Design a protein with these regions (language model features):
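Bacterial N-terminal signal peptides that target proteins for export
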Residues: 2-11
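Bacterial N-terminal signal peptides
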Residues: 11-21
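Electrostatic cytochrome c docking/interface patches
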Residues: 21-37, 117-129
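His/Cys-centered metal/cofactor-coordination and adjacent catalytic loops
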Residues: 23-30, 43-70
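Sequence context surrounding c-type heme c attachment/ligation sites in exported
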Residues: 32-43, 75-79, 90
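The canonical Cys-X-X-Cys-His
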Residues: 34-48, 108-112, 129
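Short, hydrophobic secondary-structure boundary micro-motifs
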Residues: 53-54, 93-96, 121
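Extracytoplasmic electron-transfer domains, predominantly the class I c-type cytochrome c fold
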Residues: 59-115
């Protein structure tokens, strides 16, 4: 069996994403919770689609990170959770470790990962059959 070009591209994409299963993972039960946290705490800077184009973005220097970029997608969950918890020095990204409990940080991370997978703004997954 010789893998097709689309099979090879899918494998390359999965490997680029660090093998995290981001593209194949099903929406978790934390989706709604993570989405609510994102709307409340993240959307103003990172925007509805995670591109870093929220309503506050034009006023921030440096601009907010693009959460759906290849560079962000390649980061491990641990790296992203560290950024959520500790913030980013010399940016407007605050530390959330004393604001959000660990399970909320994990839920928002799962929601951010879903933005890459679905590539659509703040829409819940379609209802099952």
């Amino acid at each position: 069996y010789l893998p097709s070009m689309s099979d090879r591209l899918l494998l390359a994409l999965l490997l680029t994403c660090g093998g995290t299963g981001v593209l194949l993972a099903q929406p978790s039960e934390n989706f709604d919770h993570g989405q609510a946290i994102y709307r409340e705490h993240c959307m103003e800077c990172h925007g509805t689609t995670g591109k870093g184009d929220g309503v506050k973005a034009p006023f921030l220097s440096p601009r907010p990170g693009n959460l759906i970029s290849a560079a962000t997608s390649a980061k491990t969950d641990q790296e992203l959770l560290r950024t959520i918890a500790q913030g980013k020095p010399r940016t407007a990204m605050p530390a959330w470790q004393n604001v959000l409990p660990a399970e909320d940080q994990q839920a928002v991370l799962q929601y951010i990962r879903s933005l890459v997978r679905f590539a659509r703004p703040l829409a819940p997954p379609p209802p099952g059959p």
